Amino acid sequence: MFNDTWRIFRDYFYLENMHGVDWPAMRERYGVMVDDCVSRDDLNFVIGELIAELNCGHSYRGGGDLERATSVGVGMLGCDYELDNGAYRITKIHEGGVWDSDARGPLSQPGVDVNEGDYLLAINGTPLDATRDPWSAFIGLSGKVVSLTVSEKPEIDDEAREVLVKPIGNESNLRYRSWIEANRAYVEKMTDGRIGYIYVPNTGINGQNDLFRQFFGQQGKEGLIIDERWNGGGQIPTRFVELLNRPNTNYWAVREGKDWAFPPDSHQGPKCMLINGMAGSGGDMFPWLFKQAGLGKLIGMRTWGGLVGLSGNPRLIDNGFVGVPTFGFYESDGTWGIEGHGTDPDIEVIDDPALMVTGGDPQLDAAIEHMLQEIETNGYHPPARPESPDRSGMGVREEDK
C-alpha cells in the first residue's frame, strides 16, 4: 500500500516535476519505515510523511483496515454549564432560530420549562455528581426521552421542577446557527440596523444555501459584511460572487410604496469580507474572486493557501484512500498564485484569543468600523424617479410624435 501510494502520486499529481521533489528518493527515505509499522494507523502516518514532502494542499491519506473502539452516543442539551455552589448551572441555552428545526435545541422546545440560570440537579431521578463531567450522565441517552430535575436553587427541594426533554446526539449545527445569529444580532445592534451580516461556511451546497438564505433576509441593508472565516471550501464559488456582484439594470415605478429595484435579488451597497487562516480551497478562491470583482476590502488574516483540486484517483487495496491534487491554480498573467500562500487581507487584524474566549471578535469589530465609514463615504444612492411624463396625444420619443 505504501508503494501503491507512491505510484499513484507519481502518475496523478498535477505537475510532472512533483514540485521539484526527488520522488524516487522519497520512496527510499520513507519506505524503510514500513517494516516498523505495527498497525494501519502507523502506515497512515508514514504515508502522510511521504506525501507531505510535496508541500501541496489537498494531499490526503486515511481510512483502511483500522482498529476502532466501539463508540457510545451521548445525549446533548445544546447548552453551556458552569460549576456554581456545588452544582451545575446552565449559563447559556443555544438557539439558532425558532423557524429552523435543526437550529432549535431540546431546551427550546415548546413546553420545556428550563431557563438560563437554572441548576441541573438530576437526570432520570439520579442526582448529578458535581465532581464529574455533566455529560457523563447522558451516555446512551441521545434521542431518548429524559427527565431533568432543575431549579433556580442549587439543591433539590419542593421548588425543583421535573422536565421531560429528548437530548440530541450532535449539537454542532445548533451551536453553528446560534453563533451566526449572535453575530448578526451584534452587527445589527452596533450599526443601528444599517449593516447586514452573512456567514458562508463553505463553497459547497450548504454554503450556497446559507448564502442565499441569509442574503435575501438582509439585502435591504445599506452595506453587507460577508464572513467566510473557517470556510471549508468545496467548489469554485463563481456563483457566490455573481450574486454579490449583480448590478441593477433598472427600476420600476409604482404608485404606492417604494419603487422596485431590478433585478430584485441584488445588493448595490458597499461590502467587505472577513477571512482567516482556517479558510481554504474554495475558501481561498472566494475572497480572491471577491477582490478581483472589486466588491470591497478583505479584513482579517491570510487564508490557508490550498488552491489545487481533486478529480479522483484509485483507492488502496484495503479501501484506504489517498487524495492526489490533479489540477492547480495559476493567474491570467501566467504566474502561480494562492497555492502555498493564500489570499492576503487588505486590512490585517489578528485574532486575540483572550478576547475570543469571552465572546469578543476583533475582526468582526474591525469590519463593523470599516463598513460604517464605507456607507457614509461610498454608500449607494438610487436615482431619483424622473418627472412623470405628459403623454397626452403623443408618443414618448420625438420620432413617435
Question: Which residues make up each language-model segment?
Answer:
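Amphipathic, well-packed alpha-helical segments that form the structural scaffold of globular domains
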Residues: 3-10, 27, 31, 48-55, ...
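Cleft-lining beta-strand/loop regions that shape enzyme active-site pockets
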Residues: 8-14, 18, 100-107, 121, ...
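PDZ/PDZ-like domain segments forming the peptide/carboxylate-binding groove
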Residues: 71-130, 205, 327-328
